[in-house]
């Protein structure tokens, strides 16, 4: 499952271990019990979420492949209970792939420059920076040094492996109007995948544990 985001980004589900019933089994092992009927299993998930018993959800694990601007990735990496591997600008020549916000992104802001001109200025700086990057590489400067001229809207790619408990924490903080708009779009994509793979857990999360706002305002 792959969801395109922004102008060139995406979130792709690479792997998932477990589902709603994984949390049920993990919770019931405390009492040496297994699965019951669907109604009672679903009720248990709601009970766990409502009362803050979150460790059973750590037994559901997702791996995502993410392509995002560097400034989004740096916010993402603040979520530390997870595993990350990122594209290396030291070992790889970086492609000309930059996030250019549309003029509509600036609607509602009192800028002294027209939004269309802001987009143009960002594109001009990006072009100049990337040309400089290529010139440095062609002149023998190592990639690890040449890359420092590139701006934060350069796209990077990384793998993110995270359990459902930490994923829900990510959604609490990033699927929220206080987060930057760009990372909100990625959080919505993560929520959509989470809902598809763990519908009972997602529903209970929204009902009892979600602290943000935008997931309740949009259809994921």
Swiss-Prot record:
Enzyme's top EC category: transferase
Record carries keyword Transferase: yes
Annotated phenotype, changing residue 53 to A: Shows 1.39% of wild-type activity
Known outcome of mutating residue 88 to A/C: Still catalytically active although shows a large decrease in activity
Entry coiled-coil feature ranges: none
Motif (ThyX motif): 78-88
Keywords noted in UniProt: FAD, Flavoprotein, Methyltransferase, NAD, NADP, Nucleotide biosynthesis, Transferase
Record-listed FAD binding positions: 55, 78-81, 86, 163-165, 169
Cofactor: FAD
NCBIfam families the record matches: thyX
Official protein name in the record: Flavin-dependent thymidylate synthase
Originating species: Thermotoga maritima (strain ATCC 43589 / DSM 3109 / JCM 10099 / NBRC 100826 / MSB8)
């Amino acid at each position: 499952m792959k969801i395109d985001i922004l102008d060139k980004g995406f979130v792709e589900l690479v792997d998932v271990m477990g589902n709603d019933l994984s949390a049920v089994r993990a919770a019931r092992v405390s009492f040496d019990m297994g699965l019951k009927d669907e109604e009672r299993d679903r009720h248990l998930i709601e009970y766990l979420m409502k009362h803050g018993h979150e460790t059973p959800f750590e037994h559901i694990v997702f791996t995502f492949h993410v392509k995002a601007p560097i400034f989004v990735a740096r916010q993402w990496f603040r979520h530390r209970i997870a595993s990350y591997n990122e594209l290396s600008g030291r070992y790889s020549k970086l492609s000309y792939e930059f996030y250019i916000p549309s003029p509509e992104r600036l609607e509602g802001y009192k800028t002294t420059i027209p939004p269309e001109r802001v987009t143009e200025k960002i594109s001009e700086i990006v072009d100049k920076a990337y040309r400089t990057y290529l010139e440095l590489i062609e002149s023998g400067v190592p990639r690890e040094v040449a890359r420092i001229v590139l701006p934060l809207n350069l796209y990077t790619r990384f793998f993110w492996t995270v359990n459902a408990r930490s994923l829900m924490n990510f959604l609490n903080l990033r699927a929220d109007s206080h987060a930057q708009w760009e990372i909100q779009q990625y959080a919505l994509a993560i929520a959509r995948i989470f809902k598809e793979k763990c519908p009972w857990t997602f529903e209970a999360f929204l009902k009892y544990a979600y602290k943000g706002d935008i997931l309740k305002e949009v259809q994921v």
